[in-house]
């Protein structure tokens, strides 16, 4: 992972309304194994978080970040100057937010594959212990990437090459509530463009409809469900969106356009690229069971809506039966 530029600044700030104090670094971080390890660990932690996706607000006095980033990329200002301008803006926003807490601010411009990214993260320390060369236990401070709550990643290549994109920025949804992370989102100047949970739910609904329309056997439906969930999970793990083209090809290598064409013909309104929402995906695993000539299979998210389990009476109640099954039952009754 080539790292083009990286720098760290420090903002001291407590969530009590006290002024934010900036300690700015005046030179980039040099190449080292430590910074490579830091960025690798940061990406691993970041990819595991639930994120929102969006795009830059129109450049203005309230949202100047995209303008500074553009000037840096065009060579009109160096990386240190860009990061200094940005962190001073962040300092002001922190002072306006009583809930904000300071920390070390990492700016890193790096490349992964053929794609350029800018990562920005607010890092905090944790107190721990270590054993020194004299085999004594001593206090030790380290960056705690497990407590990463405020961070954003900008896909620079997507931003510059695809003007229609509305999902080239991702940022962590703060655990402390919307107001805690609002100032950081405003710092980036990001407007949410894609509702990841909603898009994921729509994709899963389209998949369920597709499986029903194809009248797939239970085993085939289960295999395709696993294919979808595995692909979506792997993309979420590396912080990349799913693409409908790639997913359709994975579904059926003999008819690689079948699922894609079904989605487009039914007009589900899905974007070509969909950020996977892991919580939504986890509800989509299938329940299956066989006994004495009976075979039951349904997606986990249907439990509690179309499927109800009555444990005391050892019963499953199924609502909205498939049309084909109802027709068979009616013919048998007649």
From Swiss-Prot:
It comes from the Bacteria. It is found in: Cytoplasm, Nucleoid. Disulfide bonds: none annotated. Its main location: cytoplasm. InterPro entries: Nucleoid_associated_NdpA. Keywords: Cytoplasm. One of its GO terms (cellular component) is cytoplasm. One of its GO terms (molecular function) is double-stranded DNA binding. Pfam families: NA37. Belongs to the YejK family. This is Nucleoid-associated protein PA3849.
